Design a protein with these regions (language model features):
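N-terminal glycine-rich "phosphate-gripper" loop used for MgATP/nucleotide binding
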Residues: 90-94
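Iron-sulfur (Fe-S) cluster-binding modules
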Residues: 1-63, 75-88, 102-118, 122-140, ...
């Protein structure tokens, strides 16, 4: 899932500016599992906005914010409220925020959270596999790092192998930051550094082509509208999603 984190109160206040009446759309999946979105996040943000003297015109928890058709349906469904609003606050990752812009709600779109990386839906926060967030580098190495993202976890940002001081250091402490363990020691235990080196050579080749995508089927507009309507009106299911974590 795409992990999100709340923006600071100062930044959110700056983004809202002079908007006195706002509508709030909240994502029921990724942001919900991050603890920022869903019905609970929507209520928490609404309380804060009211504390700031803002009037919350409408609140809508969508099953997901990133699909454009769902966002379009939500904008259409809440058209009257949006026309009475000065801004649309979106509790979603960047994909949902972009969908809101594309849906043209007629008011400024204000993201309430920041996208901070891709993580598994898991409660094992003490494990580096779930702790290391994807940086969307475009060339994933998880297959040979035991599921740990070294770009995120290594202070030196090393991707295909440890820093030159790796062999010099005794014990498991990081050469750059002795207050933490060297993540490459853990990668060495769980992964395969030799194959990681071969992957580096492969990734460095110019003209390396990705597998082609299958031909995109054009879903008929009426089918998209029905699917969008169903998902917009199924937002109440979002209250159950945090229970899987």
């Amino acid at each position: 899932m795409n992990r999100t984190a709340w923006k600071s109160a100062e930044e959110l206040s700056l983004l809202l500016g002079e908007a006195g009446r706002v509508s709030v759309f909240s994502c029921g999946i990724c942001a919900n599992l991050s603890g920022t979105g869903g019905a609970r996040g929507m209520r928490n943000l609404s309380r804060l906005l009211k504390k700031w003297g803002k009037e919350v015109v409408c609140k809508e928890c969508l099953i997901a914010c990133c699909p454009l058709e769902i966002m379009r349906q939500a904008v259409e469904k809440n058209g009257k409220a949006l026309r009475q609003s000065d801004a649309l606050v979106v509790i979603s990752c960047a994909a949902g925020v972009k969908s809101a812009f594309l849906a043209r709600p007629g008011v400024p779109v204000v993201p309430a959270v920041d996208s901070v990386g891709s993580v598994p839906v898991a409660t094992y926060e003490d494990d580096p596999v779930s702790r290391s967030r994807c940086t969307n580098c475009g060339r994933c190495v998880l297959a040979f790092t035991g599921g740990i993202c070294p770009v995120n976890e290594c202070p030196a940002g090393m991707k295909y192998g440890p820093c030159p001081r790796f062999e010099e250091e005794e014990g498991d402490l990081c050469a750059l930051d002795p207050s933490r363990e060297c993540i490459w020691k853990e990668v060495e235990r769980r992964g395969d550094l030799a194959k990681l080196g071969r992957l580096k050579e492969l990734h460095s080749r110019k003209g390396l082509e990705r597998l082609p995508l299958p031909p995109r089927r054009n879903t008929p507009r009426p089918v998209r509208k029905v699917a969008g309507w169903l998902t917009v009106h199924a937002g109440w299911f979002a209250r159950f999603i945090p229970l899987i974590d």
